[in-house]
A protein has these predicted regions:
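Cytosolic juxtamembrane amphipathic/interface segments immediately preceding
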Residues: 2-8, 182
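Short, hydrophobic transmembrane alpha-helix segments
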Residues: 23-32, 51-54
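C-terminal ends of transmembrane helices
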Residues: 44-57, 100-111, 174-176
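Cytoplasmic-side transmembrane-helix entry/capping segments in multi-pass membrane proteins
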Residues: 58-67, 87-91, 113-123
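Small-residue-rich segments of transmembrane alpha-helices in multi-pass membrane proteins
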Residues: 64-77, 120-131
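Interfacial loop-to-transmembrane junctions
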Residues: 178-197
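Residue-level detector of conserved catalytic or cofactor/ligand-binding positions
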Residues: 198-204
């Protein structure tokens, strides 16, 4: 059996369902341990999937559950500080996903090689910034740029850039799914693509 677009959509729907159920559970019991454990387990599961794609039928559903636990906990924390932020984040994510899918299918956005290189490079740059911030936090260094809650215009602009780059990564996923399906990729790649989609689509 080979990968199909319909199969990928089905696997993505299953993954989202698992993520939502786990997220709701984590949101209601408000356990910091569960939230942190979800982040760590999700990260490890994602790494396993990246280096062993054949494991995706097992690791992708697990990743969805772990990330649901993590996102449910962090959503509760933000909801206590900023009223309505969780609903707004979920709504914005859904609108971005739908809009980009329509733009991709209509040909308005074409993932050329330069486009792909640019998105990958920008994503890598953002990752490095967050990595430096994470390491710096152990030494008392705080990058205010990464905190839009401080009201700084630079922080807000940076956050918008991060959202834009994360959104453009969805276009790369759409292109990958279409090409892989046309080229007869193995069936397990449906789960791999589903993991990639839910990872990028997570509200931030």
């Amino acid at each position: 059996q080979t990968m199909t677009i319909k199969g990928t959509v089905d696997k993505t729907a299953i993954s989202l369902f698992l993520l939502i159920i786990a997220g709701y559970y984590s949101y209601t019991i408000t356990s910091p341990t569960l939230m942190i454990g979800g982040f760590i387990a999700g990260f490890i599961t994602a790494l396993i999937t990246i280096f062993n794609k054949k494991s995706a039928p097992i690791t992708a559903p697990l990743y969805a559950i772990f990330e649901g636990l993590a996102l449910g906990g962090i959503s509760y924390m933000y909801a206590q500080q900023f009223e309505g932020i969780v609903l707004n984040a979920v709504s914005l994510t859904a609108l971005i996903l739908l809009s980009l899918l329509m733009a991709y299918r209509s040909g308005l956005i074409k993932p050329t090689e330069n486009f792909k290189l640019g998105v990958v490079a920008a994503t890598g740059g953002i990752f490095l910034i967050y990595l430096i911030s994470f390491i710096g936090s152990f030494f008392g260094m705080d990058l205010a740029l990464l905190n839009p809650a401080n009201g700084s215009m630079f922080s807000i602009i940076f956050s918008l850039i991060v959202i834009l780059i994360a959104s453009l990564n969805l276009v790369l996923d759409f292109d990958f799914i279409e090409e892989a399906s046309e080229n007869g990729a193995p069936k397990y790649m449906e789960w791999y693509a589903a993991l990639s989609l839910i990872h990028i689509s997570e509200p931030t």
